[in-house]
UniProtKB/Swiss-Prot annotation:
Location(s) in or outside the cell: Membrane
Origin species: Danio rerio (Zebrafish)
TM region(s), chain numbering: 40-60, 70-90, 141-161, 172-192, 222-242, 250-270, 272-292, 311-331, 347-367, 398-418, 466-486, 504-524, 592-612
Phylogenetic classification of the source organism: Eukaryota, Metazoa, Chordata, Craniata, Vertebrata
InterPro entries: Pecanex, Pecanex_C
Protein name: Pecanex-like protein 4
Length: 1225
């Protein structure tokens, strides 16, 4: 797609220009897109102006001196209450008349803006429903009606001309200005009233995707009431407060601008406003942290307010110090982890119960230090006050007595610079990403080498951790304990200040250290000479400094993001639209306005919203740092999610030391990081941070690479390579510069993580080589012998009481026979092989159906699939195999990204429509017997095939019972000629070798030789295994002298052609699964021998098979067992695939090993700004076009990846972890 793709397509543009005027006016739909009778518009216009009319009545009565101010407002409010009741009553009556089913209000129904209504007359039900959709809940009808009356009455009082003249009389404002202010203010009131009582417009500032409880109608009236509340406070104040009067004058002017602010979406919805206000007060007023969930935020906010109130009422300064230190430490912990300990579950990556006594010892030490220093300071200050002669002696000698707080201030400055320097050394980049860290290891490929080269950095990180988490809190507590403002604690500001200060010491030691250092520097630089600065007290100074530091930091980040959008709109050729030059010129000409917008967004801690991600900047509405209303952990799961599920658990343990050592930089709530490993991209968000812990959310982005995804992923790789694998450039001055500085991503660190490494190979020359395929038959027989013998031994040694006919789980799962063996039956020493004459089953028809539909039983196929690209994510389907008893689920289909297996490329498509597949012989019913579909299922005549060996077999060794096989496995109806031809292929030497090895493993060195000799000389046992193994080989279809690649692949998938004994084999489900596993093992052995060389001895073959059984899952990506093996962290996984487009067979191997995951920091304000635009674009403009401009790849801003990482339903991460608690002390 080119850069000039439309921002909104034609359909959406028409939709937007119908919706936006409705938003501006608060609900009237004056542009419908179709013809409507004039009375529809008249109704809406009358209802819109009704509040002004009713308020005018009260105003007129007041101006005529008929009523005073209060009664004038009451009259207007009562009239509005009556009108609102009538309007809502009509709406509910019409809803009842037209039936129980009624359409949703327009604010919640996107289609309501597009429906074409047939109007019959002015009071018809459809007309009333169109003008006044009504409320869903009766409680809202009552609440909104009463609120509309109160709003109209208070607005009448608020906008009385006499009041406006008195408010602005001394400013020289004339009558014209007052009249204009009066008229425009009533327009604002009419907009708020209409959205409350008539019809609610869709707001540009939308936080929740669904307005379930009809909160949106309350947004605009609540802002109006907030403005009125300030004026009421001024009216009822005993003496005119200058600050309130100025505020009222300013708010009266802003009252006129409210419709513009609503239309631009700068004012938060009530739910977002409440959460944002609680978060800001908790962080900057009470010293807490942004919380990971809304419930935690509410509980922590209320608890912190209670602590501040209690601090105000504590009578002594010593009690204040001890109480605030203890409460600060307690609330800076994640107390929910105590519940985890009580439940008996070890906390995530924590110390368990050991953390409690350690924390108790530390807080006791902190309390002791604070109490002693405070008391000593009081004693010393008392002594200095009483002993004035000593002071005069100090002054006469020219030596000023040392101030304890000043000494501690210098110590804090030293700690700050040391910890900051040690933190800078931990990351790959320094000075905000502008330069590369020369001490960070480069071109490291293995985790072992990385650990070896970063040993010195880890020692520095441990030193920093000790200084920051142990020394700094104690020093800061000492600094605050000797503060002179503790003597004036019984003021609200100081009570809040000390509560916050002692909380920040624990909650965010690094931020608290920076703030105290700035306060100390200001004091040393002569801050006492600034008017009223010294009178504020240290703790209030800390509050102001923290706000300034945060807002300045936000301003710098937002300005950097704005410059990135501006510059790349021209420098990136694929982002350069025709309007780019015009927009750049406008931004340059209106540079002061741009800076004002950036400053305002920073001041409000609101996102800077680039409209359609163009250099057109707006102030988004303030919202919590998490940006989304829901609890983290929602995702759009797919089969590929399992890889992130395994990776996230390991990544969380690797993040802990990196966070603690400072490798991630200034890690605060709201920070975002991007992790990269092979084809996987991880989005790491910091949700919450406290003393010694951090709560993170890890998201996995889709593995299927779209074109946009590929462009940005390639740039991410370039950024990481420039930092971690860069080649030294000539010149001492510029060799350390970051070549990708200015990108939204700043490389931070490498993390050793135990993760699956993905390797794909094309099997051309291996799977189609006659030499290799000729060996497959022999390997299969050997593998099947080993599996059957091992199965019997494990049954016997386990001693369980289950029957041998129980279903065995699919190969590779941890519930397979190696983990959950089935016990053997106690049987006699003499085993009789029964002669059976069985009628041929009538189920050949459904076998034909099974064979021919095997490819269409996995998932969906679409003509839009990119056959040359990655595999599309499909919803998994279950494949059912019919047996005589029931239906058995074989597995749940999943697909590994990039896989070219036949089951994932052509899953449910009719094979007749795939002419390229016909030569492969797949699903065409080849080899099946001819049947007459018109006839009923009549039992076929008895078969003439009988068991070749009809004589009873006599075990000569008493230990042969251990290796006996179930009777059902010896009942195959196969022609004796087939088995006689294959009898020489039975590996007798291998059979004897396996017997000796298994006896050695089971019995040890005791009677090993005698038992082994007896078993090897037992011809009945060998005959039994010969018969069963060869029968399985024939039934599976693996008796071909030379396999074709197509037949090998079909047998590997368990979808081979119909054979004479296939029905018998599938009826014995357990034996079928063992046989299939043996064939898959033999295919893996074939691939290994072709790659690594042939197996040279029986002992090597035995060891190889044992390794397969213990450490490998060998099967299909579409098996549910594949997912289970990934979650259970099976060391290796192997699968075959078939690329139909290229005509090649492939292998895929996942190996679990420790690899280096690259992690970089993202511009958090850039992320918030793009998410704000996404919210506006999808929830308001409904611009969900998959090819829209704002979702196109942007290699500098990483726009496509950022949109993917948003919470559903706006984003689409395929995995999102619940909040993960990490202990980082």
């Amino acid at each position: 797609m080119g850069p000039d793709v439309p921002l909104l397509n034609d359909y959406k543009q028409e939709f937007f220009w119908k919706r936006f005027p409705q938003t501006v006016l608060g609900g009237p739909r004056l542009k419908l897109g179709y013809c409507a009778p004039p009375y529809v518009y008249v109704h809406q216009l009358v209802l819109f102006l009704t509040p002004w009319l009713l308020g005018g009545i009260g105003t007129l009565l007041y101006q005529l001196r008929v009523l005073d101010e209060a009664f004038a407002g009451i009259v207007s409010g009562a009239l509005m209450l009556g009108v609102g009741a009538i309007v809502q009553g009509m709406a509910r009556c019409m809803a009842r008349r037209t039936g129980v089913v009624q359409r949703l209000p327009a604010a919640n129904n996107i289609l309501a803006d597009e429906e074409e209504v047939e109007f019959t007359h002015c009071v018809a039900p459809e007309t009333v429903r169109f003008v006044v959709p009504g409320k869903r809940f009766m409680g809202n009808v009552v609440l909104h009606t009463c609120l509309a009356g109160a709003l109209c009455g208070l607005s009448t009082w608020y906008l009385l001309p006499h009041r406006l003249s008195g408010l602005y009389g001394h400013t020289g404002a004339g009558l014209g200005a007052v009249v204009s202010l009066f008229a425009l203010s009533w327009v604002t009131v009419c907009i708020g009233e209409y959205s409350l009582i008539v019809n609610t417009a869709t707001e540009t500032a939308t936080f929740q995707p669904q307005d379930t409880y009809e909160i949106t109608p309350l947004n605009r009236p609540m802002y109006i009431l907030a403005f009125i509340a300030v004026d009421l406070a001024l009216r009822f104040s005993d003496s005119g407060v200058v600050e309130l009067q100025v505020a009222s004058q300013v708010l009266h002017v802003l009252f006129v601008v409210l419709p513009v602010l609503w239309a631009l979406g700068m004012l938060s919805p009530l739910d977002a406003l409440l959460l944002w206000a609680m978060e800001q007060i908790l962080v900057y007023g009470l010293g807490g942290s942004a919380m990971s969930t809304n419930i935690r935020l509410l509980v922590m906010f209320l608890s912190s307010v209670c602590v501040a109130i209690c601090t105000y009422f504590i009578p002594t300064s010593l009690g204040v110090v001890l109480f605030t230190v203890a409460m600060g430490f307690l609330f800076s912990q994640d107390l929910t982890q105590l519940l985890v300990l009580v439940k008996g579950v070890s906390p995530t990556l924590g110390l368990g119960w050991w953390g409690l006594p350690l924390s108790l010892l530390f807080i006791i030490g902190a309390l002791t230090e604070a109490g002693l220093l405070h008391q000593l300071n009081l004693v010393n200050s008392g002594n200095l006050t009483l002993n004035t002669n000593s002071v005069e002696n100090w002054e006469s000698s020219g030596v000023v007595p040392p101030n304890p707080q000043e000494v501690l201030g210098w110590l804090l400055i030293a700690l700050f610079f040391i910890t900051r320097l040690l933190r800078e050394l931990q990351g790959a980049c320094i000075i905000g990403g502008a330069m590369l860290n020369p001490l960070y290891p480069k071109r490291v490929t293995t985790a072992q080498a990385f650990r070896r080269k970063t040993r010195g950095l880890r020692v520095a990180g441990i030193i920093r951790r000790i200084l920051l988490n142990l020394v700094s809190p104690l020093t800061m507590i000492a600094f605050l304990s000797v503060d002179e403002s503790l003597g004036k604690i019984h003021t609200a500001s100081l009570a809040i200040g000390f509560t916050r200060a002692f909380r920040m010491v624990w909650q965010s030691s690094e931020a608290a250290l920076l703030q105290m250092v700035l306060v100390v520097i200001i004091k040393l630089a002569g801050g006492h000479r600034v008017a009223h600065w010294h009178d504020l007290g240290t703790t209030v100074q800390l509050i102001l400094v923290s706000l300034v530091v945060n807002r300045v930091s936000q301003f710098v980040c937002k300005l950097s993001f704005a410059l990135t959008v501006l510059i790349t709109s021209w420098t990136e050729s694929k982002q350069r639209r025709q309007s780019a030059g015009t927009l750049l010129a406008l931004n340059a000409a209106l540079c002061p306005l741009l800076l004002a917008v950036v400053a305002l967004s920073a001041l409000l801690s609101a996102p800077l919203l680039p409209l359609f991600t163009l250099p057109v900047f707006l102030v988004g509405f303030p919202r919590p740092l998490r940006s989304w209303p829901g609890t983290p952990g929602t995702a759009c799961p797919c089969p590929d999610s399992v890889y992130y599920q395994q990776l996230c658990k390991r990544l969380a343990s690797a993040i802990r030391p990196a966070l603690a050592n400072g490798a991630f930089g200034s890690c605060t709530p709201g920070s975002h990081y991007l992790g990269r490993f092979q084809g996987r991209l991880l989005w790491i968000s910091i949700l919450e941070k406290g003393y010694g812990y951090c709560t993170v959310n890890i998201k996995g982005l889709e593995l299927q690479e779209t074109s946009c995804h590929t462009v940005e992923a390639r740039r991410v790789d370039e950024v990481f390579e420039g930092a971690f694998d860069h080649v030294e450039r000539p010149g001492q001055c510029f060799r350390l510069l970051n070549p990708n500085w200015g990108n939204a991503l700043i490389p931070c660190s490498l993390l050793p993580v135990r993760v699956y490494s993905d390797a794909q190979s094309v099997l051309t020359g291996i799977i189609d080589s006659p030499d290799h395929l000729r060996q497959l038959n022999s390997d299969f027989l050997k593998t099947l012998v080993w599996i059957l013998l091992r199965y019997c031994v494990q049954e016997f040694t386990c001693g369980a009481q289950r029957t041998k006919g129980q279903t065995l789980q699919t190969s590779g799962r941890k519930s397979q026979s190696s983990q959950h063996p089935v016990p053997s039956e106690a049987g006699p020493a003499v085993i009789k092989v029964e002669t059976q004459v069985r009628p041929e089953s009538s189920s050949s028809s459904h076998l034909r159906g099974l064979d021919s539909s095997s490819l269409s039983s996995f998932a969906d196929w679409s003509d839009e699939d990119d056959l040359f690209g990655p595999v599309p994510v499909r919803r998994p389907m279950r494949m059912m195999v019919r047996t005589d008893e029931a239906q058995t689920e074989l597995g749940l289909g999943v697909s590994l990204p990039g896989s070219v297996e036949i089951h994932s490329l052509y899953e449910s498509m009719a094979l007749s429509s795939l002419p390229t597949l016909r030569p492969l012989g797949l699903g065409l019913g080849l080899g099946l017997p001819i049947i007459d579909k018109g006839k009923e299922n009549i039992p076929a005549p008895t078969s003439t095939t009988v068991r070749t060996n009809s004589q009873p077999l006599l075990f000569t060794s008493p230990h042969s019972e251990l290796f006996s096989l179930p009777a059902d496995w010896r009942t195959a109806n196969l022609a004796s000629s087939k088995l006689q031809v294959l009898r020489p292929c039975f590996p007798e030497a291998w059979f004897c070798f396996c017997l000796s090895q298994l006896v050695l493993e089971s019995l040890g060195e005791g009677d090993f030789e005698q038992v082994t000799q007896g078993l090897q000389e037992d011809r009945a046992l060998q005959e039994l295994y010969t018969q069963v193994v060869l029968s399985c080989c024939v039934a599976l279809g693996a008796d071909a002298q030379v396999f074709s690649p197509n037949l090998l692949f079909r047998l590997y998938c368990g979808d081979g052609p119909w054979t004479e004994g296939l029905e018998w084999l599938r009826a014995n489900k357990e034996l079928h699964q063992l046989t299939l596993r043996a064939f898959r093992y033999s295919v893996k052995l074939l691939v290994d021998q072709a790659s690594l060389g042939p197996v040279e001895s029986l002992d090597e073959l035995y060891t190889t098979l044992q390794d397969y059984h213990k450490n490998w899952f060998i099967g299909l990506v579409s098996d549910r067992s594949w997912q289970d093996s990934v979650v259970q962290e099976k060391p290796f996984l192997f699968s075959l695939g078939h690329d139909l487009t290229m005509g090649t067979y492939t292998s895929r191997v996942l190996s679990l090993q420790e690899n280096l995951v690259q992690v970089g920091a993202l511009n958090e304000e850039g992320v918030r700004g793009q998410w704000a635009n996404l919210s506006w674009e999808l929830l308001y403009a409904t611009n969900d076009d998959e090819e829209r401009y704002s979702i196109q790849a942007h290699p500098v801003m990483l726009r496509n990846l950022t949109i993917q990482a948003a919470d559903p339903p706006l984003g689409y991460p395929i995995y999102s972890s619940p909040p993960i608690h990490l202990r980082c002390l």
